[in-house]
Amino acid sequence: MREFLIIATLGALATTNASATSSWLDSHDVQQQLAAGQVVVRGAMDGRAMAARVDAAVKVHADRDAIWGVLKDCDHAPSFIPGLKRCQRVASAPDGSWEVIAHDVKYSWFMPTIHSVFRADYQRPSRIDFHRIGGDLKDEQGSWLLEPLPDGSGTIVEYQMQINPGFWIPQAIVHRSLRKELPEALAALRIRVESLQAARR
């Protein structure tokens, strides 16, 4: 059974650009973990600002187009993404270069459902950037990056997010999200993509 490996770094929240953030994936240890099928996560929290940054990655045995289709499948996303109760397209560009999407997410049984509205900008098939434009959270922004492996064995899917809910959240909830919920979401994405690809063969 594939294991989840969590790399959690608690300290000051650092804001870096995407290329600098992705350099963490070049680590030999991280590369070994990805090759072994692990979901790798690292996070940083700023308790004073109630903000957090998270980077995560997983290897998917599929090409970028297959992964892209699942990432954009709003209609079916709640059926395989843990905690996501609703995904709705609110608006979209005529040329398909961006969409406005609304999410309702239940992070924990004793917390209210969080409503989030964000704009997603698409650079097919390699990148999706998103940022908050409405909803309950004070700030939310991040990216999905799809990098094909040189040997053609699959794609590294990297997820980056900076979030500031604007209200206090118990650190136990944040730790649980890093330790359990985010790896489950990326594993669910991998399972969905690989199962759809297998069904087409």
What are these regions (language model features)?
Residues 53-58, 64-66, 106, 132, ...:
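Second-shell loop/turn segments in exported
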Residues 15-17:
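N-terminal signal peptide c-region/cleavage motif recognized by signal peptidases
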Residues 21-24, 28-35, 107-154, 162, ...:
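Hydrophobic-ligand binding "helix-grip"
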Residues 4-13:
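Sec-dependent N-terminal signal peptides
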Residues 20-93, 184, 188-191:
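Hydrophobic ligand-binding cavity/cleft-lining segments
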Residues 51-59, 98-100, 115, 127, ...:
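Intrinsic-disorder/low-complexity, polar/charged segments enriched in Ser/Thr/Lys/Arg/Asp/Glu/Gln
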Residues 162-201:
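A conserved amphipathic terminal alpha-helix motif
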